Amino acid sequence: MNAGFILLNIVIVLALCLCSGIGTVNGRTVSVIEVVFKGYDNVRKLVTWADAFSVVLYGHLYLALPLIASIASLPIICDELRTNNFYFHFSRIGVKHYIPLKYLSCIVSGVGALFLGLILYGVFVRLFFPSSYDFGDSQVIGIIENNSLRMIMSAAGYLLYMLCYVAMLSIFSCGLVSVTQNIYVNLCVPFLLNYVTSHILLNTKIYVFLLLCVLFYCTGYRLWLLKYKGVRA
């Protein structure tokens, strides 16, 4: 597992979150980081930290999920397959042990980066955005905390969906490496899969993700074995 690629993934997630639109000023959409560092207090008063987190989670972040999943598989290409270093690992641990370890590396890199990136963003908005709305003298009391709690619970459920979705894309991307070591193909194909299936899969039950993960893993595992069946394990 390459720590540099994981760090790159985390930076991508955090940057996408901070650059997401959160309000308007003079008819122009402003991002989260602009609201914080340019002092748009009129926007911040009407946006709680739970709002800021949920807006990003329900926004266009899912469009970048294939990139996060694809980058997780790049160390396999760059560090091993294209330099033939994988023969060393085959002789040391065997092909049948090497393949599951690479799948596990991709899943941890993709899912872990998304989770850590969102955690860092959550800490950021918790520090710089209020916990309750500020409507001045007309502020409504009594429902804010309950609304925030429901919003957080809903966001947590959706976050679980996103993590499962990234796990599925990571498994798919790792299996794709067994077919081609072309970096551009491995980056682009998950985007095509995401474009075709995102609106369907993001509204399904979690067990569908698990079934697809098993399907993609079994298919990719067989492809890896076929590719290196002549290699002594």
Over which residues does each language-model region extend?
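N-terminal Sec/SRP start-transfer signal
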Residues: 1-2
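Secretory targeting signals
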Residues: 12-75, 103-178
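Membrane-interface transmembrane-helix boundary segments in multi-pass integral membrane proteins
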Residues: 202-212
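Central hydrophobic cores of alpha-helical transmembrane segments
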Residues: 7-12, 182-197, 212
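Juxtamembrane "helix-exit" motif on the non-cytosolic side of transmembrane helices
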Residues: 21-23, 199-202
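Junction motif at the cytosolic side of a transmembrane helix
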Residues: 211-233
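Membrane-helix interface segments
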Residues: 94-96, 100, 182-186, 206
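Helix-loop-helix units of permease transmembrane domains in multi-pass membrane transporters
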Residues: 76-109
